C-alpha cells in the first residue's frame, strides 16, 4: 500500500492535508528518517525533533514566495524531503550527493546556505529589508535553536531587528540542547520562559473571564496600569519585548494544530515577532530520546569511510583530552575552555575531573578567545579546544586580544584538514593560512596521536600563543615514534632518501610514508621530513636540502594559499634555490562533502596520487 509520504513531494501538496493525515505523515517521516539516516549517516536527533514544526511551517506559509532560513541547517531534512528531494536521501552527505545543509544551488526552496550557528536572524533580517526596499510582499521566517540563540551574532541581530521594527518571523526551536547540553544565563532564561507557561495561560483565562462584562473590562483597564510597573518581575518574555520583538509562547512544538493557529495569525503582525516552540530532540525514536547528543550525528551503518587504522589506539580528540588531564595534575594553572563542544573536542572527562577549571561558554567563539586572553593575562594557562572551522569565527580576537599582547594561550585545533561529510562549511582547511600571518603565533602539528602529550606540554610551557592542529579520527599509520624532544622551529627527518624530499605536516606525513612504500617498488626512495613546526619553518634544514641538491614536494591538509608550502617556497626563493619544487594542498576553492578517502584522492593527497606526482618528477 502506498504511503502518504509517497504521494507528497512539494509544499503545495501539504496545503489541504487534514489534521489527522498530517499526524500520520509525521509518523511516516520519522520512520523514513530513522531508516534512511541510519544507512547514510547524518544528523538524526535534531531532525526527529522538528517534524511537526516543519510540517506546520510548510502548511502555514507559502515557500514558493515566502523565504525561510534554517540556523545551522542540520535540522532541514524534513524540509528537504517535502521540497522534492526525498529520493536524494539515498546519497545524503556523499560525494556529489544531497547536502546535509541548505544549499541555494541545490534547490529553489533553499534561500540561504547555512552550516555554522547563530546566522539565521541576520540573514533573514537582510532579506526582509531587501524585500521592503524593493516593495515586495512576502514573509521571511528564521528558525533558530536555543543553543544558537546564545551566539553573540544572534543577539546582535535581535537588537537590530527590534530597533528598526522590521517585519519578520523568528521561530525559536527550543529543545534545551545544542549538540551538548546548553549552558549560560540565556539557557536559564529560556528555562524560566518554559516554566512561565502556566502564568501566561492563567493570565489569558482571567482576561477572557473578566472581559465578558463592562465591570470586568473596567477592572482590566485599571489592572493594566499596575501591570506595567510589575510586568518585568513576573513575565520573563520581557527580554524580547524590551528589544522591540513581540514574543509569543511557549507553545508545544509537536502540536500541529496549535502551531497552525499561531503561524496563520503572525503573518498579519507588523514588526518582528518571535514564536517560542518547545520540542524534544530525538522524538519518536527511543534511543535518540534517551541520548540525544549521541544521536545528534550518526555514522553510516555500513561505514567504510574510516580510513584510519582501527588497530590504532585513540582518536586525536581522545588523546588530547587524556593528555590535558595528565598535565593539569601537575600544572595547577591549566584551565580548559570550549564553545559548546565538550564531547567533540575530548574535554568531557576533563570537565568531570576538574569542573572548577573547565569553562563551557556556549556557542561563543569570540568570547572564548578573549576569555582565554584575560585568563592568560592574569597568570593562568588556558587551553581553548575548538574545531578548525569554528576558530575562524574568533579571527579578530586571536589577533587583537591574544597575539598583539603575546599572551600564552594554547589553541587545540581539532578537525584540522578535511572532515568529510559536512562539506564546505565544516572543512578545516584554512587555519594554517590565517594563523601564519599573525605575529607571535607558533603553529605545530603532531605526526601521530602519541606525539600529542609532549607537544601539548611544550605548548603550555611556552610563554606565547601556540596553535596545535590535528585531524578528526585516528592515525592511519600506527606506532610511529613520538619525538622525544621538541625544539623550537626544528623539523624531524623521519626517513632518509635520495634525490627528492617530501616535506609534510600532521596526518599528511603518514600519507607520505605510505607513498614512499609504493615508490620503493619502482626504485625511488624519497627522503621524508616531518614539518613539526608549520610556523616557524626550519630554515637550516631547507638550506641543507638546497646544498644537497634535493627536489622538494610539500604536502599539507590545508589550502595552498598562505600555507606551509608557500612559506617554504618564499624562503627557498630568498636563498636562490634552483631545484624542482611542487606544492600539494587545496587550490583556491571550497571543498565539498564526501568520504574522506574520496576527497583525498580527488585532490591528489592520497598516497597513490602523491606517488604519481613524484613519478612525474622523473619523467
From Swiss-Prot:
Its EC number is 2.2.1.7. The lineage of its organism: Bacteria, Bacillati, Bacillota, Clostridia, Eubacteriales. HAMAP family: DXP_synth. PROSITE patterns: TRANSKETOLASE_1. Pathway: Metabolic intermediate biosynthesis; 1-deoxy-D-xylulose 5-phosphate biosynthesis; 1-deoxy-D-xylulose 5-phosphate from D-glyceraldehyde 3-phosphate and pyruvate: step 1/1. It comes from Clostridium botulinum (strain Alaska E43 / Type E3). It catalyses: D-glyceraldehyde 3-phosphate + pyruvate + H(+) = 1-deoxy-D-xylulose 5-phosphate + CO2. NCBIfam families: dxs, PRK05444.2-2. Gene3D superfamilies: 3.40.50.920, 3.40.50.970. This is 1-deoxy-D-xylulose-5-phosphate synthase. Thiamine diphosphate binds at residues 74, 115-117, 147-148, 175, 285, 365. It is an enzyme of class 2 (transferase). One of its GO terms (cellular component) is cytosol. Mg(2+) binds at residues 146, 175. SMART domains: Transket_pyr. Its cofactor is Mg(2+); thiamine diphosphate. Belongs to the transketolase family. DXPS subfamily. GO terms for molecular function: 1-deoxy-D-xylulose-5-phosphate synthase activity; magnesium ion binding; thiamine pyrophosphate binding. Disulfide bonds: none annotated. Residues 289-310 are annotated as: Disordered. The gene is dxs. GO terms for biological process: 1-deoxy-D-xylulose 5-phosphate biosynthetic process; isopentenyl diphosphate biosynthetic process, methylerythritol 4-phosphate pathway; terpenoid biosynthetic process; thiamine biosynthetic process. Keywords: Isoprene biosynthesis, Magnesium, Metal-binding, Thiamine biosynthesis, Thiamine pyrophosphate, Transferase. Homodimer.
Amino acid at each position: 500500500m502506498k504511503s502518504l509520504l509517497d504521494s507528497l513531494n512539494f509544499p503545495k501538496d501539504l496545503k489541504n492535508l487534514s489534521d489527522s493525515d498530517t499526524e500520520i505523515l509525521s509518523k511516516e517521516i520519522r520512520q523514513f528518517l530513522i531508516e534512511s539516516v541510519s544507512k547514510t549517516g547524518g544528523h538524526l536527533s535534531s531532525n526527529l525533533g522538528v517534524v511537526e514544526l516543519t510540517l506546520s511551517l510548510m502548511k502555514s506559509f507559502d515557500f514558493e514566495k515566502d523565504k525561510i532560513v534554517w540556523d545551522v541547517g542540520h535540522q532541514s531534512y524534513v524540509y528537504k524531503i517535502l521540497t522534492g528531494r526525498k529520493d536524494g536521501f539515498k546519497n545524503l552527505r556523499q560525494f556529489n550527493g544531497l547536502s546535509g545543509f541548505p544549499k541555494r544551488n541545490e534547490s529553489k526552496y533553499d534561500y540561504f546556505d547555512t552550516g555554522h550557528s547563530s546566522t539565521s536572524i541576520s540573514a533573514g533580517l537582510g532579506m526582509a529589508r531587501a524585500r521592503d526596499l524593493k516593495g515586495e510582499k512576502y514573509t521571511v521566517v528564521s528558525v533558530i535553536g536555543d543553543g544558537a540563540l546564545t551566539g553573540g551574532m544572534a543577539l546582535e541581530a535581535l537588537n537590530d531587528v527590534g530597533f528598526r521594527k522590521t517585519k519578520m518571523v523568528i521561530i525559536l526551536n527550543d529543545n534545551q540542547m545544542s549538540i551538548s547540553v546548553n549552558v549560560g544565563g540565556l539557557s536559564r532564561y529560556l528555562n524560566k520562559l518554559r516554566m512561565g507557561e502556566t502564568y501566561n495561560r492563567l493570565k489569558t483565562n482571567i482576561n477572557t473571564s473578566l472581559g465578558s462584562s463592562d465591570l470586568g473590562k473596567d477592572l482590566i483597564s485599571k489592572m493594566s496600569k499596575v501591570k506595567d510597573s510589575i510586568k518585568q518581575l513576573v513575565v520573563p518574555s520581557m527580554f524580547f519585548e524590551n528589544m522591540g520583538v513581540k514574543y509569543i509562547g511557549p507553545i508545544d512544538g509537536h502540536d500541529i494544530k496549535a502551531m497552525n493557529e499561531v503561524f496563520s495569525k503572525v503573518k498579519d503582525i507588523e514588526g518582528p515577532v518571535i514564536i517560542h516552540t518547545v520540542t524534544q530532540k530525538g522524538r519518536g525514536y527511543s534511543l535518540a530520546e534517551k541520548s540525544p547528543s549521541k544521536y545528534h550525528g550518526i555514522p553510516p551503518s555500513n561505514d567504510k569511510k574510516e580510513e584510519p587504522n582501527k588497530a590504532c589506539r585513540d582518536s586525536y580528540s581522545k588523546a588530547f583530552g587524556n593528555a590535558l588531564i595528565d598535565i593539569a595534575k601537575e600544572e595547577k594553572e591549566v584551565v580548559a575552555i570550549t564553545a559548546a563542544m565538550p564531547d567533540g573536542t575530548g574535554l568531557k572527562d576533563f570537565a568531570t575531573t576538574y569542573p572548577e577549571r573547565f569553562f563551557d561558554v556556549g556557542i561563543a567563539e569570540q568570547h572564548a578567545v578573549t576569555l582565554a586572553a584575560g585568563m592568560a593575562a592574569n597568570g593562568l594557562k588556558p587551553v581553548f579546544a575548538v574545531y578548525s572551522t569554528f576558530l575562524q569565527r574568533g579571527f579578530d580576537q586571536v589577533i587583537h586580544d591574544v597575539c598583539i599582547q603575546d599572551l600564552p594561550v594554547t589553541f587545540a585545533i581539532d578537525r584540522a584538514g578535511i572532515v568529510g561529510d559536512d562539506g564546505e562549511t565544516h572543512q578545516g582547511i584554512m587555519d594554517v593560512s590565517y594563523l601564519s600571518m599573525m605575529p607571535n603565533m607558533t603553529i605545530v602539528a603532531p605526526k601521530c596521536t602519541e606525539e600529542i602529550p609532549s607537544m601539548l606540554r611544550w605548548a603550555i610551557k611556552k610563554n606565547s600563543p601556540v596553535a596545535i592542529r590535528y585531524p578528526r579520527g585516528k592515525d592511519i599509520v600506527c606506532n610511529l615514534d613520538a619525538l622525544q624532544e621538541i625544539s623550537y622551529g626544528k623539523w624531524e627527518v623521519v626517513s632518509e632518501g635520495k634525490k627528492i624530499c617530501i616535506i609534510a605536516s600532521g596526518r599528511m606525513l603518514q600519507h607520505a610514508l605510505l607513498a614512499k612504500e609504493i615508490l620503493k617498488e619502482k626504485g625511488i626512495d624519497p627522503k621524508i621530513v616531518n614539518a613539526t613546526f608549520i610556523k616557524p619553518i626550519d630554515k637550516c634544514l631547507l638550506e641543507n636540502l638546497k646544498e644537497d641538491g634535493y627536489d622538494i614536494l610539500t604536502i599539507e591538509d590545508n589550502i595552498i594559499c598562505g600555507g606551509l608550502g608557500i612559506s617554504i617556497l618564499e624562503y627557498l626563493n630568498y636563498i636562490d634555490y634552483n631545484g624542482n619544487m611542487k606544492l600539494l594542498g587545496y587550490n583556491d576553492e571550497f571543498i565539498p562533502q564526501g568520504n574522506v578517502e574520496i576527497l583525498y584522492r580527488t585532490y591528489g593527497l592520497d598516497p597513490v596520487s602523491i606517488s604519481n606526482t613524484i613519478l612525474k618528477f622523473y619523467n
